[in-house]
């Protein structure tokens, strides 16, 4: 910094300044975000819509993966409630975060574990999470086990299922719902292609079959969130995840300044703000492109000229090029 003519700041002082900047950066991000109404509580049965996710990053001086950033994000205002930095082996679980009554924890299938769901329910919050085969035992009201693939096999393309189930958790049996949506054939083929690439020879027949569906588990009551709204809510989480992956590529999310949670929080807000600014600039192409070529005044329609002059905008006559003939 000193070489660039800027003040010389010690690492500790810079760390403290970043910590104090969090409220300011958060406020800037909240002002810049363009989807606040999408995550508003009134659209989701009064729930505070909170998405959790983890992303792999590199620490300073690293040549490979050596850290994960775990985030809890309020979708309504893109407020980061919690950020944790772990080594590359830090698992994805709801238990990393504190939960509060009225929150809806939304996450992908990595978070579908009995202990994680129990942690959220113990805080009087609810979950909306992608279902994963074999992770949590589900049964019907009579206690009979439910084979999820059998339960959804009758669905035609585009059809949905909203099935009351009971989940076996560490604290006992908890009521919930299985939400299923049969995907179009094109989407099924794309999902299966990703599974072949990710799992290779380890891909099981049941997982291959499950690619036909979007399968969700929720503890939210039907009166608050019906099946369609659950699917739309999960889709919103997925869209925001894609947006963050794009920002990660554009803004250098993959290089941590250090592995302190508080510094990383300010750093992430600054990166998100940069991503929002880039998106805002990209949405105004006329300001970034060369100015448009305007017609000469002499080519303007006479009624346009009269209108301009009537509002005290005197229009100068076009300059005429004169040719001077010099005597030989």
Spans of model-derived segments:
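Gly/serine-rich nucleotide phosphate-binding loop at the start of the catalytic core
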Residues: 1-49, 55, 317-318
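Single, function-defining residue in the core of a domain
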Residues: 9, 13, 18, 29, ...
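Short hydrophobic beta-strand that contains or immediately precedes a catalytic carboxylate
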Residues: 51-52, 106
